[in-house]
Amino acid sequence: MPPKKKKLAAIIKLQISAGQANPAPPVGPALGQHGVNIMEFCKAYNAATESQRGDVVPVEISVFEDRSFDFKLKTPPAAKLLLKAAGVQKGSGEPHKTKVGKVSMDQIREIAQTKMVDLNANDLDQASKIIAGTARSMGLTVEG
């Protein structure tokens, strides 16, 4: 007889710096209210994201009724990747008036390649257009 499927109790979505998960907010309260072992998650997440230190890595945590959990790592947010590519700290407060930096089409294509698994696009050109739109709405000029 096949093993019984665990019943899903909740799905928690968080954005945590890679390799730096700890029981302090936002991780602790989000997991604590579902009865998950917080330290166990922190150790597993930090081990899984050790190679991506410095980036913010979104994670989707599936919590089951027996309080066990499973998590899926996503790719870093497009906005963070664009800021890093442009070499600026943050986007513009007035994106369509004040431009804060420039990104080339090659950089956008590279980011689109990275984000392809999480994006709702069929090919690289469509993914590039999505990323270029994000760049424009952050006050970055797209060249090329």
UniProtKB/Swiss-Prot annotation:
It holds the Pfam family Ribosomal_L11. One of its GO terms (cellular component) is cytosolic large ribosomal subunit. It comes from the Bacteria. GO terms for biological process: translation. GO terms for molecular function: large ribosomal subunit rRNA binding; structural constituent of ribosome. The keyword Ribonucleoprotein applies. Keywords: Methylation, Ribonucleoprotein, Ribosomal protein, RNA-binding, rRNA-binding. SMART domains: RL11 (SM00649). One or more lysine residues are methylated. Part of the ribosomal stalk of the 50S ribosomal subunit. Interacts with L10 and the large rRNA to form the base of the stalk. L10 forms an elongated spine to which L12 dimers bind in a sequential fashion forming a multimeric L10(L12)X complex. Belongs to the universal ribosomal protein uL11 family. Forms part of the ribosomal stalk which helps the ribosome interact with GTP-bound translation factors. This is Large ribosomal subunit protein uL11. It comes from Saccharopolyspora erythraea (strain ATCC 11635 / DSM 40517 / JCM 4748 / NBRC 13426 / NCIMB 8594 / NRRL 2338).
